[in-house]
Amino acid sequence: MTYTPDTPTVVLVHGGFADASFWVPVIRELQASNLPVLAPANPLRGLAHDAEYVASVVGQIDGPVLLVGHSYGGAVISVAGAAAANVVGLVYVAAFALDEGESFAEIFERFGATPLVDAVRPSSYPVEGGGTAVELSIAPELYQSAFAADLPSEVTEVLAVSQRPFAAIFDDRAQAAAWKTLPSTG
């Protein structure tokens, strides 16, 4: 494939309990096809903050952008896609696509708990100005069964001990739902 100015840059947004290296196989495929790709580090500090960060990354890209989100990254691209004028579409990969005003707590209440909920472990971290806040990670021994059952154990053993925790986001409400106005698939 030949890159043209109209070819969207594919921006891959990882979810919680992971980092941008999650996308390595996809990045390799896109690069092999000569497609522009970027996989920024999702800060995992809260839905509004993370979406604002991703929108700022996207806003610095010349030309159109196709946002791709996995898991929690889907919620992030839904909000970020509404804030960045150059986003031309959204792709959800086993991802959350929250409606405007919807929270993760409502999703889990509506559809029930998953093994992931029982595998999550809270811990506290210091915040600017003093005090602490809660962040979540998956118990390493439960990582594969609760979060990545479709991946080989040699991969999940590394992911389990290198996962990035994220701030408690269950009550965060989506400020936008770009999937309502942009072409979307998943």
Residue ranges of predicted features:
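Active-site catalytic motif of lipid deacylating hydrolases and related acyltransferases
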Residues: 3-63
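Glycine-rich His-Gly loop
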Residues: 13-16, 70-71, 95
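Active-site signature of alpha/beta-hydrolase-fold catalytic machinery across serine-
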Residues: 25, 79-80
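Gly/Ala-rich beta-loop-alpha elbow adjacent to hydrolase catalytic centers
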Residues: 68-73, 77
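Flexible "cap/lid" loop of the alpha/beta hydrolase fold
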Residues: 86-130, 166-171, 175
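Helix-loop "lid/cap" segments that line or gate small-molecule binding pockets
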Residues: 129-134, 138-150
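Conserved serine/cysteine hydrolase catalytic core
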Residues: 153-186
